[in-house]
A protein has these predicted regions:
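Bacterial N-terminal signal peptides that target proteins for export
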Residues: 2-10
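Charged, low-complexity intrinsically disordered terminal segments
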Residues: 21-426
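Bacterial N-terminal signal peptides
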Residues: 11-20
Length: 426
């Protein structure tokens, strides 16, 4: 071989090796940030994130913040259940409205009507008379089929444009008390301070103006940065110093950003190198996500999933059980949470980043509804979630073929197989 050809081969080999080393050296968090930025998602690095790991923590923290509001309180929920917690909330909002604070609340029409204790028309009118602007997004009207999809499933609160809350919890007392059907109700929420509060405010005002045909806008609603200190007594961010977390908000809107959340989950799983921990209540999954999880196992990634043995709705859990059994057979470690219902929607990847938000891993959240998740690029917050995952493993059983046969009768296995055929509609 001529020397010049040998030299070219050596140079080519070195360049190829360098590309491979660079590709491997890219961490999962840098990959996901770059991919989301290509999708138009912005990230800021001056955020504080405080996890609220129970209904009691969430509502205690939220009510303390509302009591200290000075200018505006914006709430967007799938539903306000007509119970003791909602009554406390509306009484508190009435007090703030009488102080001159602007109070706006949105709820979803389907979310309200499908609730076993919905807000009735007279109650909504009474809430308005108390100074609270409250509106229903897309009320259910004939023909009802027109209103099945594109529901507002988000859970957002923004106070004074300075702090925001988001996660998996609506407004209901069962987040604290549990229910007779499922037992205790586990869920996750978080409080944000920093620039990404502005992102959540934009999401709220866009939906508010769409629903009410008003045109609410102005710099007074967008503060940015950490709060000015008038919110005291709230649960602190454990990171010291606080206010240096990278966060981006992924917002799914029908016809505008249809694929953003399913792309995030797919890219996060595909980019994992060491570990994936996933909790989601309605894990009906699509073929792409199932394939991504199986491939992660083949790459040597430790994949752990947690789902509940109890659920609040029919048929969907049968599909979930079928799916996790199939994943278990491909090497995924599946933990079956037994004390109650785990409604948490989180993923942790490589100990480097995580997400907290409203999106389930079912067809409704990934293909149809309005959803929103906070993507948190921070080892501290991810470690907190990972610790909670490991804590709940102690109250779960590991799915094996033997435990599967004890858990599901032949008839229930058939129901699960049938339910998984309906996954595109669940």
């Amino acid at each position: 071989m001529r020397p010049q050809f040998l030299k070219r081969y050596v140079i080519f080999f070195i360049l190829l090796l360098g590309c491979l080393v660079f590709a491997y050296a890219q961490t999962a968090d840098s990959v996901i940030v770059n991919q989301l930025r290509k999708e138009g998602i912005t990230f800021s690095c001056n955020n504080s994130v405080t996890l609220l790991t129970s209904g009691q923590e969430k509502f205690d923290d939220l009510f303390k913040a509302i009591r200290q509001a000075r200018s505006s309180i914006h709430l967007e929920y799938f539903n306000f259940r007509n119970d003791s917690i909602a009554n406390l909330l509306f009484n508190l909002l009435e007090e703030k409205a009488q102080e001159g604070v602007e109070v706006r609340a949105l709820f979803d029409g389907f979310g309200n009507d499908s609730n076993n204790r919905p807000l009735r028309r007279k109650q909504i009118q009474d809430i308005r008379r108390r100074g609270i602007e409250i509106y229903e997004f897309d009320p259910i009207r004939f023909p009802f089929v027109n209103h099945i999809f594109h529901r507002d499933h988000r859970k957002i609160v923004v106070i004074d444009g300075q702090i925001a809350y988001t996660g998996g919890m609506n407004v209901a007392d069962y987040y604290i008390k549990g229910t007779r059907v499922v037992g205790t109700w586990n869920d996750m929420h978080c409080r944000l301070e920093g620039n990404e509060v502005n992102s959540l405010q934009r999401i709220f005002l866009r939906m508010w103006n769409k629903t009410t045909h008003q045109n609410i806008q102005g710099a007074q609603y967008y503060r940015g940065g950490l709060s000015d200190g008038h919110f005291i007594g709230l649960k602190p961010d454990p990171r010291n110093p606080a206010g240096h977390k990278m966060v981006g908000i992924i917002n799914r809107e029908p016809h505008t950003s249809n694929t953003i959340i399913r792309r995030f989950y797919t890219d996060a799983i595909n980019g994992a190198k060491d570990s994936i921990k996933l909790i989601n209540p309605y894990l009906t999954l699509n073929a792409t996500l199932k394939r991504a999880l199986r491939r992660a196992v083949k790459r040597g990634v430790k994949v752990e999933i947690m789902v509940s043995t109890h659920s609040d709705i029919p048929l969907t859990p049968d599909c979930v059980f079928y799916n996790v059994h199939q994943l278990m057979r491909h090497g995924v470690r599946v933990w079956m949470y037994t004390p109650g219902f785990h409604h948490t929607k989180v993923i942790m990847v490589d100990g480097r980043f995580c997400t907290v938000g409203s999106a389930n891993l079912n067809a409704r959240s990934l293909n149809f509804d309005y959803e929103e998740n906070a993507v948190i690029i921070d080892r501290c917050t991810t470690a907190q979630l990972s610790h909670l995952f490991d804590r709940d493993k102690a109250q779960s059983f590991l799915l094996t073929q033997a435990s599967w046969n004890r858990f599901r009768s032949p008839w229930k296995k058939f129901v699960g197989w049938f339910a998984h055929l309906l996954a595109p509609f669940l």
